[in-house]
């Protein structure tokens, strides 16, 4: 589950091996707010001309359980006499709503379709300021200039913190869109390499 945590990462810098002029114009700071310690999404090959990032089953397990757990409690609350109070109904609604909200934001898909020549992100994420990204997130694949890998340290009150990594798309106009944000460095680098090969674009890796 994505948790909104304090970002304690030092200011990132452009990798020394990158000489592309656009690299000096883009931001090298984390793009999204929070993150997860485990693998939140993975790159899936849908066909010869399409790949997409999907949330992992483990990542959506908890919100799904919250949503499903709320249903029988809501039903019991509706059927119970008013004299017994509305506590169960409120509890069920709360569990259902929290699960539904988390599930909505955690079932993001980032689709790269060579046949249509379009990249589409089906959900908006929270940016580094805690606000929703602008919509719609649909751009031409030809506008993608490079892939950017960043690291950040996340910490919450009473937590020792953990490392989280971002994979972002970089566009010709110096804009960025996040497509992966989790704590498994090896797997996010593997996904970045596979996506770079699919798109024929370079990877700008600022993770040290």
Placement of each model-derived feature along the sequence:
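Short, charged cytosolic
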Residues: 2-48
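Non-transmembrane, membrane-adjacent beta-strand/coil modules in membrane-associated proteins
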Residues: 6, 33-35, 120-187, 206-207
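Short, ordered beta-strand-loop transition motifs
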Residues: 38-54, 113, 155-161
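Conserved beta-hairpin
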Residues: 43-44, 53, 99-143
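Alpha-helical transmembrane spans
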Residues: 48-111, 177
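Short, structured motif recognition centered on aromatic/hydrophobic residues
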Residues: 51-53, 69-72, 110-112, 119, ...
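A short, polar/proline- and glycine-enriched secondary-structure boundary/capping micro-motif
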Residues: 62-66, 130-134, 189-191
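Cytosol-/stroma-facing membrane-proximal "stalk/adaptor" domains immediately downstream
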Residues: 184-208
């Amino acid at each position: 589950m994505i948790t909104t945590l304090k970002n304690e990462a030092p200011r990132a810098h452009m990798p020394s091996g990158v000489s592309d002029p656009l690299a000096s114009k883009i931001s090298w700071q984390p793009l999204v707010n929070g993150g997860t310690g485990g693998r939140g999404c993975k790159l899936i090959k849908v066909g010869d001309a399409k790949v997409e990032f999907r949330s992992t089953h483990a990542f959506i397990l908890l919100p799904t359980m919250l949503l499903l757990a709320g249903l029988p409690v809501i039903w019991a609350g509706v059927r119970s006499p008013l004299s017994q109070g509305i506590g169960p109904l409120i509890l069920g609604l709360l569990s259902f709503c929290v699960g539904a909200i988390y599930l909505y934001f955690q079932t993001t898909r980032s689709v790269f379709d060579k046949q249509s020549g379009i990249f589409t992100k089906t959900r908006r994420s929270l940016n580094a300021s805690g606000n929703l990204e602008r919509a719609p997130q649909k751009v031409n694949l030809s506008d993608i200039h490079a892939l950017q890998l960043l690291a950040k340290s996340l910490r919450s009150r009473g937590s020792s913190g953990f490392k989280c990594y971002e994979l972002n798309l970089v566009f010709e106009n110096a804009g960025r869109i996040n497509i992966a944000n989790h704590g498994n460095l090896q797997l996010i680098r593997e996904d970045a390499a596979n996506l770079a090969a699919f798109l024929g674009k370079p990877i700008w890796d600022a993770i040290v």
